[in-house]
Every structure is written in C-alpha cells, then in structure tokens.
Amino acid sequence: MRAALKWLGRHGLRVVAVVVFALLALGLVPECCRPGSVVLPRLSPILSLLGALGARQWAGWAVLLGVPLLVLSFFRGRVFCWRFCPMGFLAELASKLNPWGRGAVQRVPALNKALALVIAVTAACGYPLLIWLDPLCIFNGFFAAWREPLAWASATTGTGFVAILLLSVAVPNVWCHRLCPLGGLQQAAQDLAQRLRKRKAAASPADMSAAKVARRTVLAAVPAVVAGLTAKKGLGPNGAKAVRPPTADPARINALCARCGNCMKACPYGLIHPDLGTTGIDGLLTPVIRLRSQDPDQEQFCSQSCSACTQVCPTGALRPLAAQLKEQGRFAPIGVAVVRKDLCVAWAENKDCATCDEYCPYQAVKLEKHGDVNCPVVDPDKCRGCGACESNCPAEPIAITVKPLPRR
C-alpha cells in the first residue's frame, strides 16, 4: 500500500494527464469542453507551429497553442515529457514489462533530434515530412478509432499507438529516449539555450565545440532540404485516387496530415475514413471520403450544411471552411459526379427518372431531352462532389458516382 501511494505521489500528475487527454480525445466531456479534443494535438509545436509553416497559412489563435511548450523547453528541457505527455507515460509503463531489456536502448542511436530537424526543415520547404510521428497526434489518433459507427478501417488510426507500446516492450524506453521528435525538439531547444548561455559567459566567443555542433546541424539539414523540395515536386501519385474532405489540397495532404483522426471523429455522418493505400504509400491513413455511411438512418453524403471536419484539423491539411460558403458552393470541389449512361434508368431504359436532379443541392444536374425522356447531365463547373446524387440514385448498380478530381 505504501509503495502504491509513493508511486502515485511521483506519477499522480501523469496519470491525471492521461485520463484528461483520453477523455478529451474520446469526446466524453461536457459540450462546452469538446473543443479540447482539437486543442490536444495543437499543444505540440510540431503540429501547431511547424504545421502552420508547412501549410503556409495562419489558422488563428490555435497556432499559438504550441508556443508555451516550446518556450518552456528553453528553460526546463523535456519537462513536458517527464510530467505531462500521455504517450510517453504509457510507453514508459510498457517498458517496465521487460526488465531484462533495459540496456538495449543504449545500442540504438539517438534519432529524435534528427527527426525533429527533418520535420522543421521540410516544413520550411512547404512539405513537412514525418509530421505524423508527433506523440500527441498518435495518442489522439488511437482514440479517434473509438467512434460510432465502429469500423475496423477506422481503427487503423491507432496503429502508431500500438506500435509504440510494442516497441517499448521490445526495447524499453526507446521511444522517449531515442525516437520521439517532440522530445527531440524540446531537447534541441534546451541545448540551444545552454549553448547561448555558455557562449555569453565564455571569455572567448569562439567556441570550437559549438562550431562543431553547428556544422553537424548544417550537414544534417542538407538531406532534409533535398527531401522536402523533392517531395514537394511530387513523390506521390500522379493523380488523386480518392475523394478527399473539403478544402484538402490533394498535392500536399499526404505531408500535412498528422493522421490524428480529428476529422474522422468530427464527421457527424461517418463518411471520413483512413486511406489504406489507394493514394500511395505516402498517403496511408490520410482522410478519404466514402459517400455511403454505415448508418442507413443518417445522411450518406457530404452535407451542404456541414463543415465540421475543416474546423478541427491541427496542421492546416484541411483549411477552415465557413458553413455559409459551404452552403453556397463557394469552395473547391472534392470530386465530380459522372453519369453511367449504360446503367441510368433514363438513358438506358427510356424511363423518366430525375432523382439526382432533385437531390443535388448545388443545381449541378440538368435534364436534357432525349426522345421523350429527360436525361440527367452533370455540369462539372457547378458540381462540388458532395455525393447527394450518388447516395440517392435508385438504379442498381448505381448509375451516378462521384469520381476524384485529377491532380493538377
């Protein structure tokens, strides 16, 4: 009993942090506290500051949420890791399951600062690689899987969480001490602060050790610059292969997306799912839209009145979209509807059917007279790819489907 109380005395704050962050991520809090699930990933300067840098956009006050942690790191180093980080605490508990492997971490090179440098430099290039390694977004992504309706594909957002725990059992403390980029960023900030203090106190400003460190940093940054610029020019697929949520930039979402699962949790219709390979390896677990939800009682298309997913992205992969603009169709299309004339009741069977025209909220479907029957034709300039036509088409198989827009 005394040992348990002693343990709680040392780690009580970390336990509270895990519980609070988990409740926020799950949304099991009062309505007034629901924005906390959006705030959690943005507490990391990797997602808030470097994400905004990579997206080249100012996302309001939320960008500043990562500033306190970054400033604190200059004075207290990795205090967030050792006192508050929920992912780090769980990884530490998992490490205790293998007391025989405690020394194994010493054989693993410290990559955390290098990973933080890669993210920072590639963000400056406009294509932030590896941003999804942030521990807060990994923690958040695991709890994003527990949403209604449950789907095994959605559970894949928690693979990083499980992988870190398994890795911590195999090589105790390897995540926190060797791999975590957020820890590396905090350590780099503390190292910089200490170096500046030593330089100021030194009698001679020419510090050879500092010069060596600076030289190593420059040498490490060069490959990151090359990777960022090369990826920005197009390491991904040549064309979009999936319908993305509104405001997503198909050319950069694979890099900007943190795989935190916020957009999937926010969608009230359960239409957003993690990609499982249709957009290439670099697009794994990024959000894609499936225009037929699992709940037949809910709307099965991207509603004209909903822009919830665009309000919760911590990195700018989805840009905020005002509900009024969504209703008016003043946003970039997420896809375009295509009529299969061989399957369409009007075109193939000469029977009157105007269901797609009736349900289209953007008046993108017009009827053209062919013989005695009015047949649907899609105006690609008006179509936003919402899928209202597809989800209500009475034909079997469906005669009108939303196709992804080709990448420009």
What are these regions (language model features)?
Residues 1-408:
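Non-ligating segments of multi-cofactor redox enzymes
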